[in-house]
Amino acid sequence: MAMGAVCDPFHPDLAGKTLDIMRAVASFLGNPTQFSTKMPIGPELAKEIPRGLPVSPLVTIITLEKAGELEPKAPGPEERLKTISILRKEGLKPMLFLRPLIPGLVEDELDDLISEAKHHGAVGVVVGALRVSRPILRRLSKIGLDGPIRARLKKEPPVGGLVPVPSRDLKEMAMRVAREKGLLAFKAACCANAYVAGVPCADLCWARGFCSNCPNKCLEKLPPVEEKAVREALEKAFGLEAREVSLEGLRLLVEVRARQGMEKLLDKARRALEVATRRLVSLRVVRA
């Protein structure tokens, strides 16, 4: 479970609701739960974070020097670094969320930023690329950061659309620096969440060529796959009848009987099975 993709879960107007949700998850589900935030979290608020479920805190800091220009309305990096310290003192495993990596900025700040995060108690770093639109590029041009980004783009972003900025070298650099400083390094937030919970990554990064090679060792923690459970899940959740179920290495192969209107269900069913079984899933439709 990830909190923070749409809005900051610890914004003062939302913190109470966020804690209510986390308590409910702790009481009834126990899902590994991750949140990303830029908000200051003080000792009293940190103590309210439920301990009955694995919690992976990500604290977003992308710059120390240009925070006032890039994020004028957000709390400064000093407050966020203090949040890392407080969360660590409460027994959690906070990580620096270094996303997005901004070309032309991160190269000069990377060493200091990761050093500060470690000094304040971060156990790892999660990296991620920048995505830009035309309006974002215009805003970045006002502080002289659009040039290095445009140099990496093959063409102008489409009207109304976002495009990822190629950043493989920056990701590798950030992960290398983090490891050199004794921190864990993750290519994706889901990997950090899985590491904290001690479970295989739900996005199957280890099977899709996106593994961070962290100490979690997902392959050693894969759950057993029972044919009966697969059949029941498809029937009860999606109304699909499994004709054949087989496991070949890391891939689960399922033949499902064709029926009217099933096209919209197949992708959802495949994704649900992948999360449940932690295997790559191939669904093949067969006629009766």
Where are these regions (language model features)?
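C-terminal accessory extensions appended to soluble enzyme cores
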Residues: 140-288
